[in-house]
């Protein structure tokens, strides 16, 4: 299906020069002189290489038909993640680098959305929020209330994020997976 370049959004799967790419970032630029154009940062689905392309906003680009399926994450090893299709119970693997830094948010039994192009899995969408345990947090410095201060904390998956000063080691929190930020304490 062909779409105008100005309709490209992060998460789209495009076909360009005979290869399929996952769109990571887009930016529309309107120079003072000349026509507007869009810069697109994208990742080659097969090789994982990142590339940047620039198109005029009126150009047409081939968008791949994507089939989204609900799948359950089973486990990961040194190089692959294993998932199970929730409808057919069929298992498949994907390379660990598909998710990049956010792979630490995957938990056994987590339900995720996997995008398929021509029957092959190409990308994973994590739930927007996940529950994580704080395993390491710096102590609070008393009297430091003049500015809104956040302190670094280490989560059970090894990731470090900034959390409010009242959080302590061992507490369970909710983390936003899109920007790796603290949302709130877990109530439950």
Swiss-Prot record:
GO terms for biological process: peptide biosynthetic process. It is found in: Cytoplasm. PANTHER family: ELONGATION FACTOR P, TRANSLATION ELONGATION FACTOR KOW-LIKE DOMAIN-CONTAINING PROTEIN. Pathway: Protein biosynthesis; polypeptide chain elongation. Its main location: cytoplasm. It comes from Paramagnetospirillum magneticum (strain ATCC 700264 / AMB-1) (Magnetospirillum magneticum). Keywords: Cytoplasm, Elongation factor, Protein biosynthesis. It comes from the Bacteria. This is Elongation factor P. HAMAP family: EF_P. GO terms for cellular component: cytoplasm. Belongs to the elongation factor P family. Involved in peptide bond synthesis. Stimulates efficient translation and peptide-bond synthesis on native or reconstituted 70S ribosomes in vitro. Probably functions indirectly by altering the affinity of the ribosome for aminoacyl-tRNA, thus increasing their reactivity as acceptors for peptidyl transferase. NCBIfam families: efp (TIGR00038), PRK00529.1 (NF001810). One of its GO terms (molecular function) is translation elongation factor activity. Disulfide bonds: none annotated.
């Amino acid at each position: 299906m062909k779409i105008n370049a100005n309709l490209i959004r992060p998460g789209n799967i495009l076909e360009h020069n005979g290869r399929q790419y996952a769109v990571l970032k887009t930016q529309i630029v309107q120079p003072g002189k000349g026509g507007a154009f869009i810069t697109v940062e994208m990742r080659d689905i097969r090789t994982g290489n990142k590339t940047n392309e620039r198109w005029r906003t009126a150009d047409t680009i081939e968008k791949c038909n994507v089939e989204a399926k609900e799948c359950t994450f089973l486990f990961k090893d040194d190089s692959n993640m294993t998932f199970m299709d929730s409808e057919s119970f069929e298992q498949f693997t994907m390379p660990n680098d598909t998710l990049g830094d956010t792979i630490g948010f995957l938990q056994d039994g987590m339900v995720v959305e996997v995008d398929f192009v021509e029957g092959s899995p190409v990308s994973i969408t994590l739930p927007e929020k996940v529950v994580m345990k704080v395993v390491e947090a710096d102590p609070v410095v008393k009297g430091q209330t003049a500015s809104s201060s956040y302190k670094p904390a280490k989560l059970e998956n090894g990731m470090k994020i900034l959390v409010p000063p009242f959080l302590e080691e061992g507490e369970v929190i909710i983390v936003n997976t899109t920007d790796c930020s603290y949302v709130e304490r877990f109530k439950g």
